[in-house]
Regions:
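Short loop/turn motifs at secondary-structure junctions and domain boundaries
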Residues: 21, 48-50, 67
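Short, surface-exposed secondary-structure edge patches
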Residues: 57, 73-75
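Ligand-binding loop in jelly-roll beta-barrel domains
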Residues: 86-106
Length: 106
């Protein structure tokens, strides 16, 4: 028996979900964690608008995000800072540089 096992791609596709938005400028990998559904992702420099269906908690891993939540106020979030987006809402993101993030879904 080998000391390691490489999963077939069909198994990998069932365990990790790949998301791509805005012509590939925003991409994430999603999976179930002990904290619930989570994604780890990257955003190229740019301006984006997203919609939520559940509460989302976003943690900036690298870079800086300017965020406009439904209240209409812009806030800046740096590395290791987090913010929460309400369910069933839209929010705007401006990235002046490439950004990495983690998102937890309630």
């Amino acid at each position: 028996m080998p000391k390691f096992y490489i999963k077939p791609m069909s198994d990998l596709n069932n365990s990790v979900k790949h998301n791509s938005y805005f012509e590939g400028k925003v991409q994430s990998l999603g999976l179930d964690t002990d904290k619930g559904i989570a994604t780890v992702g990257v955003m190229k420099k740019g301006t984006y608008q997203f919609s939520t269906s559940t509460v989302e908690t976003i943690i900036v891993v690298s870079g800086v995000m300017d965020i406009k939540l439904p209240e209409g106020v812009w806030n800046k979030y740096n590395e290791e800072e987090k913010f929460e987006v309400p369910a069933n809402s839209k929010f705007d993101i401006v990235c002046d540089t490439d950004v990495a993030y983690i998102c937890y879904y309630a």
